[in-house]
Amino acid sequence: MIIRVTLPTHLRTLAQVTGTITLDVPEPVTRQAILDSLESAYPMLRGTIRDSTSKERRPFIRFFACGEDLSHQPPESPLPGEVTSGIEPFRIIGAMAGG
């Protein structure tokens, strides 16, 4: 399935892309499948979004779809139909911290 993905600016710069990217993701479309496809298409992103060994989400990285934070859902959970149909993008957000 063709999935739209948005990346934070620093990762778009690293991947040398602008705007939303599209990926061909095998079914079932899950966060894990999207990240596997993303890292395959853009190898320079390996280890930036999730740990390259454990595949755990990196601190300060969040995942959103349809206005909902999916960061704490299991990586193999199916994504909303709006994402799998291409209506809504899967968003990878670089969280902010500080005081």
Where do the language-model regions lie?
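Ubiquitin-like/PB1-type beta-grasp interaction modules and other compact soluble beta-rich domains
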Residues: M1-G98
